[in-house]
């Protein structure tokens, strides 16, 4: 962490680079408000503090859903700090908001040899380079440009010596999309492309493809309700309806697959602010108060409205 803040992380490689500490602070603030007016609440509010949100393969949200604690919940709302939106605004988008996120690991095994005698080996680095180009070609040429699909190789490891043809390469990456059928498609095509690679270049490859978060899809009526709350408590100028969704992922999707609701983006953007997951990421703490107000009001007014309909 390079923020220089007095509460900066003291552990190398570990920091709050995605704003989840501010999410907890906001929810605790909302809890304090709701507790102070609990006698006026016409129902129960359950608060979820994002356990294991950053772990895509073992998301905490799915564990919460599986526990059954949300079985009697009528609607659910959440937020995430969002540097792409200005401080003082809230992003409210109907439908697709954030993508599904899958994780894959690939091992391409060749045969090492002296760098002067490549014909006596099977170069796993050349094979890996070939495969990466094939992936990009599949995404660019087999996918409708209007259908969102992103595949990124984030890790590639292979080779030990400059003059030795590499015998093993390990790759790791992610695929993002909004459509379940696209997840099926890309998993199948990654496997098929490795099989073709093995036939062409005499490698032996394996694919370990793991499904992560599903797509975060907001209920239109829930967004309309949240918009009315933002307008009432933060002002109409605070409302932003983003034109495009994000290819980032969020385990709140597990809740929205089960319960009507919406996920909101709380603007934290200021001049020169770094992106999420950057070592210099921080927030403008001015966003905490409106975040608290919004979340408390969403819960309190929902219960009031639900009670009046009975």
Enumerate the predicted regions with their spans.
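Metal-dependent amide/peptide-bond hydrolase catalytic core
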Residues: 129-310
């Amino acid at each position: 962490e390079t923020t220089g803040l007095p509460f900066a992380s003291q552990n190398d490689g570990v920091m709050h680079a995605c704003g989840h500490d501010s999410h907890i602070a906001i929810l605790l603030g909302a809890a304090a408000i709701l507790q102070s007016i609990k006698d006026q609440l016409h129902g129960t509010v359950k608060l979820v503090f994002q356990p294991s949100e950053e772990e895509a393969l073992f998301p905490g949200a799915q564990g919460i859903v599986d526990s059954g604690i949300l079985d009697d919940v009528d609607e659910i709302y959440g937020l995430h700090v969002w540097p792409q939106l200005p401080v003082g605004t809230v992003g409210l988008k109907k439908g697709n908001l954030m993508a599904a996120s899958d994780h894959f690991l690939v091992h391409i095994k060749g045969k090492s040899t002296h760098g002067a005698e490549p014909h006596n080996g099977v170069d796993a680095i050349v094979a890996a380079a070939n495969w990466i180009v094939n992936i990009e070609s599949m995404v660019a040429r087999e996918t409708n440009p209007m259908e969102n699909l992103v595949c990124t190789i984030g890790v590639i490891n292979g080779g030990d010596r400059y003059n030795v043809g590499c015998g093993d390469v390990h790759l790791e990456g992610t695929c993002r999309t909004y459509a379940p059928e696209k997840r099926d498609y890309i998993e199948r095509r990654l496997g098929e492309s490795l099989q073709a690679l093995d036939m062409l270049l005499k490698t032996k490859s394996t694919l370990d493809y793991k499904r992560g978060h599903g797509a975060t899809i907001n209920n239109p009526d829930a967004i309309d309700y949240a918009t009315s709350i933002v307008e009432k408590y933060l002002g109409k100028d605070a409302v932003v309806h983003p034109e495009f969704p994000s290819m980032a992922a969020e385990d709140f999707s597990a809740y929205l697959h089960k319960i009507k609701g919406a996920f909101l983006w709380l603007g934290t953007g200021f001049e020169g602010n770094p992106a999420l997951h950057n070592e210099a990421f921080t927030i403008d703490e001015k966003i905490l108060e409106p975040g608290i107000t919004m979340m408390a009001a969403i819960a309190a007014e929902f219960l009031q409205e639900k009670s009046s309909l009975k």
